[in-house]
Amino acid sequence: MTTDTANLLVGEGWRDSIEALVRDRMRGLIEEILEEELREALGRERYARLMTETGAAVEKSQGLGEEVTATAATVRGHRNGRRERDVTGTFGKVTIAVPRARLDNGDGTTREWRNKTLPAYRRRTKEVEALIAGSYLSGTNTRRVGRALASVFGRGGVSKDTVSRAWRKIKTDWEAWNKRALSSEDIVRLILDGTVVRVRLDRRATAISLLIVLGVRGDGQKVLLAVRSMGGESEAAWRALLDDLIARGLKKPELAIVDGAPGLEKALVSLWSDIPLQRCTVHKLRNLIAHAPKRLAEEIKADFTDMIYADTAKAVAARRQAFLRKWRLKCRAVADSLEEAGEELFTFTRLPPSQWKSARTTNAIERLHEEFKRRIKTQTVLPSAETAAMLFWGLLASGQITLRKVDGWRTLDRQLAQPIDLAA
């Protein structure tokens, strides 16, 4: 290590240098994107000009050292200087030189060019707004949020008024999302599950349930349909949530994947009496293990996994019978618990095998639960029930978590096959 390098690493100066370099690179990148957008709008490179009304002109483009040709047919306006705008992102606060231009309307008049990279009045990226709102939702007041985030965005980058505006924007988006129409959504499958969080209610820490509904579109894409804070996972709680979705246009799905909670299943059947249900196999495995001594846990898991992950529907059915025969003798409670689940635990076998992985569990929601709780693990209690739901929604709305297509989505249009008759 050289003396200069050693001196640079003393104190915090090296961090400031790196952060300044990152901000400078981001500023240059944003300005280049704006330039490219304007070049496409004008139909010519910067500094290229027409020498005649009908012919083509050739001129050196500044800094490029190459010839640029522009014709009367391609030129659609002219540049009109620049203006500076401050933008705050996760990289900090930078000042951008935004190009200006006038575009021809074709009738002798012009209009101001508006870029799409930095929409008018946007001073912060969506990620920053989500970070600000998330800090506020976590129970920190506006002034403290501003002070806490000053180390990220620079002194004065996030005022309490900025926090308030970001919060109001998130609140407005949240309310609109909860009222949006669902009639145009091509939902063919539902995945439903709940998770418990602790919130402050009447000045006391109280456990509530967050009820989550994911939808699967006909093209396989998963979408968040609802997240609602409730006192528990009763039939009434789930029914209220589902009634709201139906009132906004949700159509009957072809399959519902559930965690096995009796209240949820009753709510679904009360709305759609013949809807096929798939009980989560992961939840059921936990339930089976709970019915036996701990020393048998690994053996139960091995037998259950061998059954559920068999290659064909017939193989699953055969291993199901073998599981029941063995555990009726070894631990009757385990066999009784599997029988209690009934055919709903094996609905996935009526689907094309390519869909089995995504159809037999509620893991799509479980992963969201895990990520949500990882984000809030430093807080033992959230400020309120509503903010808990908003925080969960905000992780997806801000793009911090993305949902992908389900496995086997190309075969989603196939109908469920008839269940295998175990008595045959």
Listing of model-derived features with the role each one plays in the protein:
Residues M1-L8, G13-W14, E36-R39, R44, ...:
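Acidic/histidine-rich catalytic cores and adjacent linkers
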Residues R79-R82, K93, P99-Y121, E127, ...:
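RNase H-like nuclease fold core
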Residues A133-T140, W356-T361:
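Short basic-aromatic helix/loop recognition motifs at nucleic-acid
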